[in-house]
Structure formats: structure tokens, C-alpha cells
């Protein structure tokens, strides 16, 4: 893959304008074949190769058959092998689609690099680890937030039009249109393919990333330009001559009556943009009228430019000081925090009261209990029950699974302000683990505790707690929080809570 990308860099113009010949190179499908085997984790690839319809030789024969035909539509038409059309059951079509995606991904990566270099004034962080510290640092300085939910349902022709802006190869666009229309990627099925399909994740993710990339490439500069044009307010610094001339034209009262205590400040509005999946947050520092106009322009821009009908709930504006919002499994709200500052100058002592804003993130305990009840760790009321499906495992595996669940939850919600409520979740998992072991050995919880003692789930937790707090206890205050983010823990939980929030909103 790296060698193919290096070779394509030498012939960038050829790759952008003539992608269609690359789709018939057999080495690309060999790369896709190896990628599919590594992704599926198959330890016996020979069983796949001997199948009649899941053979890599079938892919090579299909490529040669396409070369001899004048019309590529027969590839997806009503041929003798009807199973070839069923992409979710046909390994040949998956390999062809993987090779098709590889060619598009390389060209898309080159285009995205030029776009990032052209975004002057924007500092982008492309890691999920930066989301929560970034929001904790930037949101307290904002007063409004716009919550945008981009719909999954996309018309195939919109995707074709997006690719047509940076690929001028007509046969490639025809092939893409053919795949989108004939392979269950219609407007009704594209949402299902992107959300639930596990067979063809790479192509679906590429379509989704291309669509979101196109939205952001137009949306973010548009919002920035709008707020920069609305940010300068006349009436600031009335002691200056050039400002006084402008004030005379717009102010209806004499300048002599302007009190020095009511001098306006010249501030530039700023915005911050955060996105995870189809959920986007835009933090704004401006007036209510500016936010209302921004929502109006966002709605019409996405509706007319991408031909999408946005329901009213998909774009909502909230005032951070009055309401809270949920994002990636956290309930967040901005709260004012008074501070008393004492300044001593010679013999005088001055006491000043300052009010600052801070972002408080709360763990949704009820949602966590509902998820545990759904996975049969407890009942609806929160009473722990045994995990019967794990009784066939060994004792070490059972302890390790329960321990891993708690450690992941503890790390994910390490920055929440209600960590004391998480210990109730720990109690449920602890008793559920003991009941599972008791059910396996056909004994009681008391016998299990006597046999395992301190090794029952709490030993590993104490080590993790000490490793987290000991290194920061000397440098941090009691009000500061630690965001302990690990890629193996935060990504699955963030995706899980994102799906839960989407289901609640749609229902």
C-alpha cells in the first residue's frame, strides 16, 4: 500500500484524472485480499480459497471478463452467477470493492493534505483523546453551543457529485454510480449499510468520511467568515477620534453623557468546532442574534447545497449558562465559580471577587445502570444478578472480564465530577462477579469470598487507582480532574454512547 502511494505521488495528475485503469490491476486486489484476511482474523485461509464463490481466482477471472466486455454494467447485471450480486455473501465482490476503495483512498488522502494546509488560522487536532480536555478548556469561554447531527441517509447522486469535484475521470464516476445504485446503496439502504454493515466497513467509512469532509470544507470557513464580519462593534473607546466620528452617526444621545463605566469593549467573536461521528458541536462567543442567524444559515446551507432535509431537532442552539447537553456519554454544563483574590500592596490589603466559568461533566449513572441491566449484570432496579453466559469460562477469565469492565468505566469517567456515584456501579459488578462464580461452582457468595479473598475484583482496581493518583497528587489541586484516556478504552465506549444518544433522539 505504501509503495503504491509513493508511485502515485510521482504521477499525481495521472492518478487524479485517469483512475479507471487502476481498477483493473490485479496487484491492488491482492492487497485487498490480504487486508480482508487480516481484518477477519482468519487463521485458515485455505478454507476460503477452496470455495466456489469465495475464491480469489474468481476475482481474477472477473477482471479478465470485464476487460473483454464493452459494457461494465454486465458485471452487476443479471448474469448466470446471481450470487455475485450479493455483496455481503460474495468474497469476490468484496475484494473488487476493496481495490476500488484503495484507489480512492490514496487520491482522497492527497486532496485532504492540501485542504489542511489551506486552513489558515485553524488549529486542528485529529485525536479522540483531545476532545474532553479541549472542551474543558474552551467551552467555559463560550456562551452558546450549536449541536448539529448530520443524517446518515445520503442520496447516491450527492456522493457522485462530491467525487466529481476532485476526480475528472468519467469512467470512475460511472463505476461509482453503478456500485451505489445497484449494490443496495440506495437512499433507503445506505443508512443501514453505514450503521449496521460489518462486512463492508471500509467502503462505507470512506463514503461517510468523504461526505463529512466535503461538509466541513465548506461549512467551517463559512461560519468563520460570518462571525468575523459580525464581530466588530462601534462605540468602543469613545476617547479616540476615529471612533467618535462613527459614534456620531449611530448614537442618538450626546457623547458627553456616556459614562466611563459603560464603555463597550472591542472583542472578536471566536468559535470552536468539535466532531465525533455524525455529531458536531460548535461553541460560539457572541450574541443571541448572531447564534440565531448562524443556525439559519447552517440549516439552509446543508439543505440546499447537499439537498438534505434537516429536521429541526438536528440543529439546535443552547445557552451554556442555562442548559446542559449530553455528548459521548457525559452530561455537561457550564457553571459559574466565584473566586476570592487577595492582593497586598505595602500596608493595604485588597480583596477582589472574581467569577469564572468551568465545565462540569457528569457521568450518566442511570444510563450506565440501564446498559448493565441490558447486558444481564443486574435487573432493572439495579440489583446484581449472575452472568449465566460466563459460567462456562474459567475463574481467571471471569475475574478478568469483570475487572476490565470496571477499569474501562473508571478510566473513561475519570474526569467526571460525580465519581462517588461510580462506586455503586463497582458494587453491582462486584456482586455480579461473586454470584457468577458461585453459580459456576454451585456454592454461595460467602464461600466464594472466603476462597478468593482480596483477589475478588478489588485487587486490580486498587493498583490502577494508586497508579493514577500517585503521579499527580503532588502537582494537582482537589478541584482539578484527570482525563485518563487510552485508545483501547475510550473509542469503544465513545462509539457506544454515541449510538445510544442517537437512538434516544430518533425515538
From Swiss-Prot:
> In the UniProt record, does the keyword tRNA processing occur?
yes
Q: Name one GO biological process term.
A: tRNA processing
Compartment list: Plastid, Chloroplast
Major localization listed first in the record, in broad terms: plastid
Q: Cite the InterPro entries for this sequence.
A: Domain_X, Maturase_MatK, Maturase_MatK_N
Keyword Plastid appears in the UniProt entry: yes
Query: Which Pfam families did the record assign?
Result: Intron_maturas2 (PF01348), MatK_N (PF01824)
Q: List the record's Gene Ontology CC terms alphabetically.
A: chloroplast
Question: What name has this protein been given in UniProt?
Answer: Maturase K
Q: Which organism is it from?
A: Calocedrus decurrens
What is the name of the gene encoding this protein? Answer: matK
